[in-house]
Design a protein with these regions (language model features):
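Short amphipathic alpha-helical "interface-anchor" segments enriched in bulky aromatics
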Residues: 84, 319-359, 367-371
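Flexible loop/turn segments at secondary-structure boundaries
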Residues: 91-94, 150-152, 185, 195-196, ...
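An anionic, glycine-rich sequence signature occurring as long contiguous blocks
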Residues: 7-14, 233, 238-335, 339-342, ...
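Acidic/polar loop patches that form or flank catalytic/metal-binding clefts of enzymes
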Residues: 217, 243-245, 335-338, 349, ...
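Short, conserved catalytic/metal-binding motifs centered on acidic residues
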Residues: 69-70, 84, 104, 108, ...
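Domain-level cores of phosphate- or acyl-group-handling catalytic modules
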Residues: 193-251
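Dynamic "connector" segments at or just before major functional cores
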Residues: 1-168, 175-195, 202-212, 236, ...
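Basic, amphipathic alpha-helical segments enriched in Lys/Arg and hydrophobic/aromatic residues
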Residues: 347-406
Length: 445
């Protein structure tokens, strides 16, 4: 029973100067698994990425610690910034971010208002440049998509976009994502978008990738809403192969549906577990308004829809079957966005201010990369979703011990510890700059 007049204990103020790394210090935490990501962050020079991006910081909470605090919420399946208060007294998580304790919700909210789109773009560029050699060294194809993040408050000042989960348009903040096709890693995002910016976003991603690698992407897959025909023409002029969907007009459908059966060629999609594999394809070359030159159109029956599906591509050497099979892989970006909504809580809108949301979206990209890296390291879990990885590995209690020349994380006994031991995530872990250049070591009972 609470004593009369007793008050709740007040947590300490986040201050990097109060972080103690004295040998012998031992900190208990119920989510010691978050330290599994430290070797990756140290190897990728995360602190240097933050400095190069120019994020603001203070004497109490440097920029690196502020961004690590925001990233921690994403890694720990927390819906809102206010949920950081769940860890007010978890000094081990403060140590993870280079602080004595994690900042409060008011700091994180205020901090996001101090950032600019240039900060996020520079950070994403550095992040992808360092992550690519580890997860997608031969990146060639990307799936692109818009995702409207619904707003449930006063809709004044916000544009209305179609919300698939509601089946109607509503006030929302529009975000854009690009995902590398094979690794399923999110590699670009932008939430500082208006409806006027929407048509040119595909080319902005192409420019982003060109700046990173010195060449344009080889293949892009996206639906009909992402780029008008004039933007498709610009992609063609830059020799970027694309496959997209064409909107179906009534007159166009009538013409195609009256074609004789001999015009339709059979094809089989070699995709395991796909329900509709046997197709019939009519392949033709057409011209479109605002598109310079010929373009290839594929009319397809057998995809499980009542009417034809129309594909457009500027690639002529590939077979029609291969183009459709390439586009079928675009479902991965929709799956990835579904994961971002369910685990990284993308739809829990941080604010009605787009720049504020842009920070949250950038943290989603970083958290996605962290979990894809973790999945790649664990034998048998390379295709595991973040929620599964979190439940089996990250959501593990443990003891963080500071020793003379290293930080040791002692994990509690769990059934999946042998998989972590086999992965040896801490092998050759570089010094962690925001922890006095101490390396991290993991031990398992």
């Amino acid at each position: 029973m609470t004593e009369p007049g007793a008050r709740p204990e007040i947590p300490a103020t986040a201050d990097c100067r109060c972080l103690s790394l004295a040998a012998g210090r031992r900190l208990r935490t119920r989510v010691a698994g978050v330290f599994l990501f430290l070797p990756l962050l140290a190897r990728m020079h995360f602190d240097q990425q933050i400095q190069q991006a120019g994020y603001p910081g203070s004497r109490l909470v440097p920029a690196t610690s502020a961004l690590l605090s925001l990233l921690t919420l994403k890694l720990l399946d927390k819906e809102r910034r206010s949920h950081i208060n769940d860890f007010n007294f978890d000094e081990a998580l403060g140590l993870f971010a280079g602080l004595n304790t994690l900042p409060k919700k008011s700091f994180l909210t205020d901090y996001s208002y101090r950032t600019q789109r240039a900060h996020q773009r520079t950070l994403l560029a550095a992040w992808v440049q360092n992550l690519a050699p580890l997860l997608f060294p031969q990146a060639e194809a990307f799936s692109l998509d818009f995702h409207p993040i619904p707003y449930r408050g006063d809709p004044s000042g916000l544009e209305r976009h179609y919300l698939p989960r509601r089946g109607r348009a509503g006030p929302s903040v529009l975000s854009f994502f690009a995902q590398e096709q094979e690794s399923r890693v999110l590699c670009f995002a932008n939430a500082n978008l208006t409806r006027a910016d929407q048509p040119g976003e595909v080319l902005r991603f192409v420019d982003f990738w060109h700046e990173l690698t010195g060449h344009d992407p080889q293949w892009l897959y996206f639906d009909s809403k992402l780029a008008p025909y004039v933007e498709l023409s610009r992609l063609n002029q830059r020799q970027v192969n694309f496959v997209t969907i064409r909107r179906r007009g009534a007159a166009l459908l009538r013409r195609l549906e009256t074609l004789p059966a001999s015009h339709w060629k059979p094809a089989v999609l070699d995709i395991p577990k796909r329900r509709h594999q046997h197709l019939r394809i009519f392949d033709e070359t057409i011209r479109l308004r605002d598109y310079d030159g010929p373009i290839r159109q594929l009319a397809v029956k057998g995809l499980g829809r009542e009417r034809l599906t129309l594909f457009l591509s500027n690639n002529f050497p590939e077979t029609g079957r291969n183009l459709i099979q390439r586009y079928a892989g675009r479902n991965r970006v929709e799956d990835g966005l579904g994961i971002s909504v369910n685990f990284f809580h993308l739809d829990c809108l941080a604010s009605e201010v787009r720049l504020n949301v842009d920070v949250d979206v950038a943290m989603t990209v970083l958290a996605n990369g962290c979990y894809r890296w973790l999945a790649r390291q664990l034998r048998g879990f390379d295709k595991a979703a973040p929620k599964q990885l979190y439940r089996k590995f990250v959501e593990t209690g443990g003891l963080v011990e500071v020793q003379d020349n290293r930080i040791v994380v002692h994990f509690d006994k769990r059934a999946h510890n042998p998989i972590l031991r086999e992965a040896a995530l801490d092998h050759a872990c570089p010094p962690v700059p925001w922890l006095n250049n101490l390396p991290v070591v993991f031990t398992y009972p």
